[in-house]
A protein has these predicted regions:
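Surface-exposed, charge/polar-rich loops and edge strands
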Residues: 1-371
Length: 371
């Protein structure tokens, strides 16, 4: 039996006007401007419950209304080859469904811990709205044959093509019998995949399923790529207020710590750089540095501060990124490579939440999959 299965999806008829970035990346002013200027924006659906006493039910009604309109077209169950062309690279993968039973059997390998409160909140949301609007992203190992098959499909004219925020998006529906048969045969060779983005969404789907044991089989909407295409980045961690007494505990538990120039960037010798009360330090590498990152997160969590996160761009130092925020504590680190992530997942380990920031990131509202 193949790891992945075909899905019946709804796709927007005007994707360049409909799709959005992650909802939380828009400011209130941006959301208001877009919703005023663009009646087709997916923000209208997500904002439907903003002033409602039952917000998730209001969003569900907004979904039902839009799916009955001409804004979305329903397609027969199948696979979609999806290509994202960015300025620096091109991603080519497969949009398909990962059955819940595969997740329960451990075939979706995880590498990052999650926040329980967020899972419960997202699970309750999914339970009410009954729609998945953003795929998880997962990587497939030893997928050269699959990549060749997918790239062969991209030679033809795409079923859908549009540009959003300078990126070109192309979709090919797999409808010819020969390609479909070859694709299913190739998918049958995979026993598992690695979750790259969407740990909370995957956990929330299991939450919903656990509350409705007798419902129809549930699939996790996903975008599946060969591992070689995954691009690794990382987060900044910062804490606005941290007791000064925490410094002694931190230095005692972390091992060799050395002060350094404020603009020091993480490197192979000093993979973790942090700033504490306006002084910058590095943690010296001793064997694998990843356990030190886990220990740092644990110590911060035990002190009960509010840890905040945002993605780190290449070559950004702590002083560059926090010049206006001046938090008591900030940290940046080398991205974990896919090989390191794979090792964590294969040994059933867990990186701290918000440790890995991996590309590609997908749009919301491009694929709708009813539960």
């Amino acid at each position: 039996m193949a790891l992945l299965e075909p899905l019946s999806l709804y796709l927007p008829t005007q994707p360049e006007k409909t799709v959005i970035k992650a909802y939380n990346t828009y400011s209130k002013a941006e959301r208001k401007r877009i919703m005023t200027q663009n009646p087709a924006s997916f923000l209208h659906i997500l904002g439907a419950g903003q002033n409602d006493v039952e917000p998730t039910l209001a969003i569900r009604w907004a979904y039902e209304k839009v799916l009955q309109s001409s804004a979305y077209q329903q397609y027969t169950p199948g696979y979609w080859v999806y290509q994202i062309e960015a300025s620096d690279r091109t991603y080519t993968g497969l949009v398909a469904g990962l059955p819940l039973r595969a997740i329960q059997q451990g075939k979706l390998r995880l590498h990052e811990a999650t926040f329980g409160a967020r899972i419960a909140k997202l699970g309750a949301y999914l339970e009410d709205v009954q729609i998945q609007a953003e795929p998880i992203v997962a990587a497939l190992s030893d997928a050269e044959q699959l990549q060749s098959l997918l790239e062969g499909k991209t030679v033809g004219k795409p079923t859908i093509e549009y540009t959003f925020n300078t990126r070109t998006h192309r979709l090919w529906q797999v409808v010819d019998v020969q390609t479909y048969t070859m694709l299913e045969k190739e998918l049958a060779t995979f026993n598992h995949c690695y979750l790259i983005d969407g740990h909370h969404r995957a956990a929330a789907l299991q939450y919903v399923a656990s509350r409705h044991l007798k419902t129809k089989p549930i699939h996790l909407l996903g975008y599946f790529l060969p591992e070689a295409q995954i691009k690794a980045a990382s987060f900044f961690w910062f804490i606005r207020k941290l007791p000064k007494t925490f410094q002694a505990t931190l230095f005692e538990k972390l091992g060799p710590v050395a002060s350094c120039d404020a603009n020091t960037l993480p490197n192979v010798h000093y993979p973790i750089v942090f700033r504490l009360h306006k002084q910058t330090y590095t943690i010296q590498k001793q064997g694998e540095w990843y356990p030190q990152l886990c220990e740092l997160y644990r110590l911060l969590e035990e002190s009960e501060p509010q840890i905040e996160f945002f993605p780190r761009k290449n070559k950004q130092s702590l002083t560059h990124s926090f010049a206006k925020k001046t938090p008591d504590f900030s940290c940046c680190y080398l991205p974990l490579s896919f090989a390191e992530i794979q090792k964590v997942a294969d040994t059933h380990g867990q990186a701290p939440p918000k440790t890995t920031y991996l590309h590609p990131k997908l749009l919301t509202g491009q694929f709708l999959s009813p539960l």
